[in-house]
Structures are given as C-alpha cells and as structure tokens.
Amino acid sequence: MYNKIIKMKEIIENSLQKAISYSEYRILVKELLDEGKSTGLSQSDDLLNYSLLNDKRMKRLDKTIKVSEETIAKLKDVKEPQTWLVLTEGWCGDAAQNLPVINKIAEENSNIKLKLVLRDENLELMDGFLTNGGRSIPKLIALDKDNKVINTWGPRPVVATKMVADYKAEHGSLDAEFKKDLQVWYNKNKGENVQENITSLLK
C-alpha cells in the first residue's frame, strides 16, 4: 500500500511537470485545429469535428460563465495553496462544458492553481483515477502543497451524471439524441451544478 502511494505521488509529480495552464491549453487546441488535428493519440474526422465544436463552445463559455456569490464566498475557505490538476482532451464534450467553469472558479482564489494535462499522454495518471473502471474525462485531482490528493471530481456534475446513469439503465448506451439533450441541459444550467459540486469538496 505504501509503495502504491509513493508510486502515485511520482506519477502525479511527473504529470505536473508536463502540465499547462488553461490559456495554454486553449491555444494548443486552436493550433492543432489549424493543422486539421485534435488532441490525443487517435485522429479521425469525428474527433476533429468534435474538437471544432468544442473550441467554439469553450470560447462562448469563457465569455458568458459567471461565478455565483455563494461560490465566491465558499472559495474564501481555501487558505492554503492547492493545485487542481485536470485530465482532459480537446474532443471531449464534457470537458468543453466544464473546463471553462472550473477555470473561472480557480481564478477567484489566488491559492488555487489550475493545471491541465492530456489524458492520452498521461495514462498512468488516468488509471489511478478511473470512474467506474473507465478513463472518463474531465477528471479534476485537487492536490495540497505537498502534492497529496485532497479530493477528486469528474467527469460530470452530479445532475448530468444521474441523467447519464438513468439513460444507460433504460437504453443500454448513450445515443446521439441523448447527447444532444445533455448539451441542452449544460447550456441551461450555465455551470451552476459544477460550482455547487466543486465548492462542496473544498477543504
């Protein structure tokens, strides 16, 4: 057990060395799109199209997401430095909806430093933080000043997670119609559920 903890600490610290800021991530995604590519080890027309859509989505959310007064008040409880390390990819719809919100939250407290890494380039890290056995993203890993894990969040806010689970239970898998409904929910919710979830994890 002790060896596993030491190993994970090494994996986290290796990933932190490669991590980039939110603004650097936005630039990276855009530069790859200009080359006709998405992030990740696999390339396809579908992934490229998802990435193009997500870039537009994130651009809009960067301008429109508002952090609530309640969230700002709760963020004042963070007195010690934290790093929020997030696994993501440009083609991921959930990442596109949630990362702009996470970034806005982190910007409200100078003790919180947001860092991003690409999932496919950090599979050892990803495999330490699976969701129901899957490499689901985005995955936020909150670390203290010694890079010990405080808490984790992701890949979706609680309400969206329940929507996905209920649909899978009834239909077996997620189809295009459901994915459209999920995006409609995200747009209506305007990041409120993400803010509620993440502030409830703050220490």
Regions found by a protein language model. Give the residues of each.
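Local sequence-structure signature of Cys/Sec-based thiol-disulfide redox active-site neighborhoods
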Residues: 76-104
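Non-globular targeting/processing and membrane-anchoring segments
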Residues: 1-81, 127-133, 145, 150-203
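Residues forming well-ordered secondary-structure scaffolds
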Residues: 97-100, 135, 193
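Thiol-based oxidoreductase modules, predominantly thioredoxin-like and allied folds used
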Residues: 84-88, 102, 110-125, 136, ...
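Short acidic/glycine-rich loop or secondary-structure boundary segments that cap or lie
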Residues: 94-95, 124-126
